[in-house]
């Protein structure tokens, strides 16, 4: 991977960077049979009310159907292409299986066109192969990790992320993992995961350069509450630049914004977390 820098021909181009896609991607034409329509909701629900702020606009996109379950077992596949996916910051690979089926999977660091991969109970510990956590050695970096067997990968799917296997329980029921965030948690040993780290690891180094590039991505401006009217935000109103008039900042709906823990401690998975991501080391 490489970061592409631009000459400061305009103010928007100054300090702008982007991913050098030509260095990794092999085609710009997606597989038609694995495309689906994607309608932009602009952050609205079925009643037209904003449920997620700062969303709307952006370039028209088609959804790529990704195989997160890796449930095509014991059938060898060949990586045909490495492609761009507008719906995620990771790249994707088109896999041609021996029985003729085609599927998209996440691109892992080290994958190349022509590489053979397989999802199997006792697959080799090789980048791109998928296997149950109980059969993957300790210390291995993995991605696309399931939380429930058969549900499909839910953890470590973003560009540059990975999960490390720290250990296994004596009874063989759970495997202990360390996530990118620093959290240490247990996952059922029968859950599948894919070997390797997700590619496009330099994505977080991209400098978008100008507001327009974020608008192309469907991200709208974030406006401070203190410059709104009082009917739009609790911080709004007043003549000129005035304090918020409260002991502590609040959300647009009046709830405290700082120092409040947002995780529900009554979730059943709470007992599986060995160490919190924000625990003092």
From Swiss-Prot:
Gene Ontology molecular functions: rRNA binding; structural constituent of ribosome; transferase activity
SUPFAM superfamilies recorded: Nucleic acid-binding proteins (SSF50249), Translation proteins SH3-like domain (SSF50104)
Domain of life: Bacteria
Region (Disordered): 222-281
InterPro entries: NA-bd_OB-fold, Rib_uL2_dom2, Ribosomal_uL2, Ribosomal_uL2_bac/org-type, Ribosomal_uL2_C, Ribosomal_uL2_CS, Ribosomal_uL2_dom3, Ribosomal_uL2_RNA-bd_dom
Biological process according to GO: cytoplasmic translation
Keywords: Ribonucleoprotein, Ribosomal protein, RNA-binding, rRNA-binding
Keyword rRNA-binding in annotation: yes
Gene Ontology CC terms, in alphabetical order: large ribosomal subunit
Ribosomal protein found in the keyword field: yes
Pfam families cross-referenced by the UniProt entry: Ribosomal_L2, Ribosomal_L2_C
NCBIfam families: rplB_bact
PANTHER family: LARGE RIBOSOMAL SUBUNIT PROTEIN UL2M, RIBOSOMAL PROTEIN L2
Subunit note: Part of the 50S ribosomal subunit. Forms a bridge to the 30S subunit in the 70S ribosome.
Summary of the function given for this chain in its UniProt record: One of the primary rRNA binding proteins. Required for association of the 30S and 50S subunits to form the 70S ribosome, for tRNA binding and peptide bond formation. It has been suggested to have peptidyltransferase activity; this is somewhat controversial. Makes several contacts with the 16S rRNA in the 70S ribosome.
Family: Belongs to the universal ribosomal protein uL2 family.
Name this protein carries in UniProt: Large ribosomal subunit protein uL2
Species per Swiss-Prot/TrEMBL record: Mesoplasma florum (strain ATCC 33453 / NBRC 100688 / NCTC 11704 / L1)
């Amino acid at each position: 991977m490489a970061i592409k820098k631009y000459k400061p021909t305009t103010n928007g181009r100054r300090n702008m960077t982007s991913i050098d896609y030509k260095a990794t991607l092999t085609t710009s034409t997606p597989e038609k049979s694995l495309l689906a329509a994607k309608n932009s909701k602009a952050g609205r629900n079925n009643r037209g009310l904003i449920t997620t702020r700062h969303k709307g606009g952006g370039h028209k996109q088609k959804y790529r159907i990704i195989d997160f379950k890796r449930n095509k077992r014991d059938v060898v596949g060949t990586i045909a292409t490495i492609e761009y996916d507008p719906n995620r910051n990771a790249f994707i690979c088109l896999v041609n299986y021996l029985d003729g089926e085609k599927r998209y999977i996440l691109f892992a660091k080290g994958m190349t066109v022509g590489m053979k991969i397989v999802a199997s109970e006792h697959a080799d510990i090789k980048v791109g192969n998928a296997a149950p956590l109980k059969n993957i050695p300790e210390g291995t970096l993995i991605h696309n990790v399931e939380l429930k067997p058969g549900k499909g990968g839910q953890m470590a799917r973003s560009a540059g992320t990975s999960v490390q296997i720290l250990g296994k329980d004596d009874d063989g029921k759970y495997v202990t993992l360390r996530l990118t965030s620093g959290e240490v948690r247990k996952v059922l040993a029968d859950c599948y995961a894919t070997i390797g780290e997700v590619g496009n690891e330099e994505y977080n180094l991209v400098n978008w350069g100008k507001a327009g590039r974020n608008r192309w991505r469907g991200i709208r401006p974030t406006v401070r509450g203190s410059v709104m009217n009082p009917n739009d935000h609790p911080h709004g109103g007043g003549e000129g630049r005035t304090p918020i008039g409260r002991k502590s900042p609040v959300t647009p709906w009046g709830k405290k914004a700082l120092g409040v823990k947002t995780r529900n401690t009554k979730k059943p998975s709470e007992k599986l977390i060995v160490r919190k991501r924000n625990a003092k080391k």
